[in-house]
């Protein structure tokens, strides 16, 4: 029955009359049931590392909305923590990490093979979900792309322009490339373990890919994505991979072929008609409604949703947002989006 799942059919290249739908950050603070479970966990990281509660928040949007996929509840910064970086979250400000800016800092990191000790609760979450999800729902695992994860490890926090990572790339290229290689190796291990625990699809989030230009994009966004995808395909040939090089612009063209991913997720700066012509010709695309519509709602939500469905209707497409849903979103607007996508069913 596995291939009857709508997400897997899209990822296999099938054009469907009604695209399957899920939503980045669909388990999140916009949902009252999520806020209640997070309060029970105590804090964000405790929620990530509690398999029963992490599975519960992953299931909540499936119960409420009947999305075609559930995405594992975790965080891209668990990998640096598993490598030995200190990680904590500051309320209202986001993540903080101990920084990796010198060879001595890098030497303190553990080998990629050691990540499973820290990450084993995540695999348990996947195992619980693979048992508890409805049979028609696809389970998606994920990790951050090496470049994006490195930007946090180098700066110790999110930065508007990823300046510290760009500076290290220029000033100590061997260290920068060694860090990327370590993250790449750990990511292959992590995603492979998620698949072995029951993930049916994996997604690589390169949230800051757009700040890499020209040759740097090819070396530090495309190449790690290619390495991760190739390694996963060698071990798990039937498991599809979704790549998300956010704000890659023209570099979305050719991303399927250059990396080997089965699907390319598009941010909402991308014109859907342009992407249908230039990106979807190479394979499945995912996206790309602006997440602001989940806040504002109204007729604009319906019109933009219909436009995206129509633009991508001639090829394989998974409907999603172009960015994660925000905490101020209205849950009713999510339902309206889903109803609009499925109105042709």
UniProtKB/Swiss-Prot annotation:
One of its GO terms (biological process) is protoporphyrinogen IX biosynthetic process from glutamate. It comes from the Bacteria. Its main location: cytoplasm. SUPFAM superfamilies: UROD/MetE-like. Its EC number is 4.1.1.37. It is found in: Cytoplasm. The record marks 75 as: Transition state stabilizer. This is Uroporphyrinogen decarboxylase.
């Amino acid at each position: 029955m596995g291939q009857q799942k709508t997400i897997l059919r899209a990822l296999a290249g099938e054009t469907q009359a009604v695209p399957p739908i899920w939503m980045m950050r669909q388990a999140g603070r916009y949902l009252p049931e999520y806020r209640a479970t997070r309060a029970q966990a105590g804090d964000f990281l405790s929620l990530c590392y509690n398999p029963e509660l992490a599975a519960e928040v992953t299931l909540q949007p499936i119960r409420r909305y009947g999305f075609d996929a559930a995405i594992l509840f975790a965080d891209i910064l668990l990998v640096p923590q598993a490598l030995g970086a200190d990680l904590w979250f500051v309320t209202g400000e986001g993540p903080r990490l101990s920084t990796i800016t010198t060879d001595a800092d890098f030497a303190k990191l553990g080998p990629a093979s050691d990540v499973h000790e820290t990450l084993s609760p995540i695999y348990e979450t996947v195992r619980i979900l693979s048992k508890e999800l409805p049979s028609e729902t696809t389970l998606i695992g994920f990790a951050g792309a090496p470049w994006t994860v490195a930007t946090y490890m180098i700066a110790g926090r999110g930065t508007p322009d990823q300046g510290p990572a760009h500076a290290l790339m220029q000033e100590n290229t061997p260290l920068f490339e060694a860090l990327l290689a370590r993250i790449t190796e750990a990511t292959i291990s992590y995603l492979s373990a998620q698949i072995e625990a029951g993930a049916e699809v994996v997604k690589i989030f390169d949230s800051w890919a757009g700040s890499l230009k020209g040759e740097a994009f090819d070396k530090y966004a495309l190449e790690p994505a290619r390495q991760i995808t190739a390694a996963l395909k060698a071990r798990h040939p039937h498991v599809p991979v979704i790549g998300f090089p956010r704000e890659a612009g023209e570099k979305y063209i050719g991303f399927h072929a250059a990396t080997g991913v089965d699907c390319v997720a598009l941010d909402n700066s991308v014109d859907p008609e342009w992407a249908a012509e230039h990106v979807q010709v190479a394979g499945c695309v995912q996206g790309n409604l602006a997440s602001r519509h989940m806040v504002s709602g109204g007729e604009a939500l319906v019109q933009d949703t219909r436009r995206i469905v129509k633009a991508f209707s001639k090829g394989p497409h998974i409907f999603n947002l172009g960015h994660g849903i925000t905490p101020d979103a209205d849950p009713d607007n999510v339902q309206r989006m889903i109803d609009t996508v499925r109105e042709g069913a």
